[in-house]
């Protein structure tokens, strides 16, 4: 459960992404594919070279979905219902991949916003991403 302080930290962090959601999301995906090559199996039709338009486009979708979730912290299941259905029933993404991407997102944010990435912000973002992952995997059962 996200506390009031967690919610403030999450919203502030996503607002700081500004006009760069595709860049941050794409970089996080790139980190995931390099660190965990088995995650590439879901993207066989993509150009997975660093900085490719496919990575940026999908990275923007990921970042936009997280921004939407950050705007609906009191109703994550409602905000992410369509994505949960998509990932569980159509794409059949292995649930562990959400944790891997969450880790890569945290690393990317820490690398680009070191002054803002305090231990409290890190903890809040980790809780947020864990909550998002839980919602996205809820329809697997």
Swiss-Prot record:
It holds the Pfam family Globin. Coiled coil: none annotated. Residues 1-141 form the Globin domain. The modification N6-succinyllysine is found at residues 7, 11, 16, 40. The modification Phosphothreonine is found at residues 8, 108, 134, 137. Heterotetramer of two alpha chains and two beta chains. The keyword Transport applies. Involved in oxygen transport from the lung to the various peripheral tissues. One of its GO terms (cellular component) is haptoglobin-hemoglobin complex. It comes from Sciurus carolinensis. Keywords: Acetylation, Heme, Iron, Metal-binding, Oxygen transport, Phosphoprotein, Transport. CDD domains: Hb-alpha-like. This is Hemoglobin subunit alpha. GO terms for biological process: hydrogen peroxide catabolic process. The modification Phosphoserine is found at residues 3, 35, 49, 102, 124, 131, 138.
